[in-house]
Amino acid sequence: MTDADRFEAFVREYQDMVFATAVRLLANPTEAEDIAQTVFLRAFERFSSIGTSATAAGWLKTVTTNLCLNHLARYRARWQFFSELDRPGDERYETTVAAASNDAAEAASRQEALEQAVAALPDHQRVPLVLFHFEDMSYKEIAAALGISLAKVKTDIHRGREVLKRAMTGVV
């Protein structure tokens, strides 16, 4: 197997994780694709050291998170959070539901509603919430990564949760 083949297999193994992390943080699939490409360019440059490492997934998540945070800081004023979410026919955002299962359909409906509610949060609430719940970062780690106080992290996560609770009230 050539180096190119090994890197192609590496990308296939981790591309969904990298893309999902970027989409959760950016709430914009197009920007997430750009970040994912940059992540894999950096991975290619360091492939000899990370390609077979047991910590490759962690390295990729860290690089993805940092690139997303940098992107948010640079382009915050120009962001449009809802511009490309929920595109009909885009398989990455459609939940496959077994037609015979009402429970699965209800779960899919709740999942979609939650994803929309998270995407609708202002970035100062969404980013810490995603880092805490999806990336398993501590409050202190989030504060350090975002360059904000620990109290602000706690407040933003709390307020984000409250908005999500209100948005999810009555969702099947």
Feature names for model-found ranges:
Residues 1, 5-7, 80-86, 140, ...:
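C-terminal edge and immediately downstream basic/flexible tail or linker adjoining helix-turn-helix-like DNA-binding
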Residues 1-20, 30-33, 44:
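A short, charge-rich alpha-helical start-of-domain segment used by transcription regulators
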Residues 9, 89-119:
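Acidic, proline/glycine-rich intrinsically disordered inter-domain spacer in sigma factors
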Residues 20, 34-41, 54-66:
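Structural recognition of an alpha-helix C-terminal capping motif at a helix-to-coil junction
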Residues 40-55, 74-76, 167:
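Sigma70-family region 2
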Residues 51, 65-83, 93, 99, ...:
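Arg/Lys-rich amphipathic alpha helix in sigma70-family domain 2
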Residues 65, 69, 113, 117, ...:
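DNA-recognition helix of helix-turn-helix
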Residues 128-132:
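A short pre-motif secondary-structure segment
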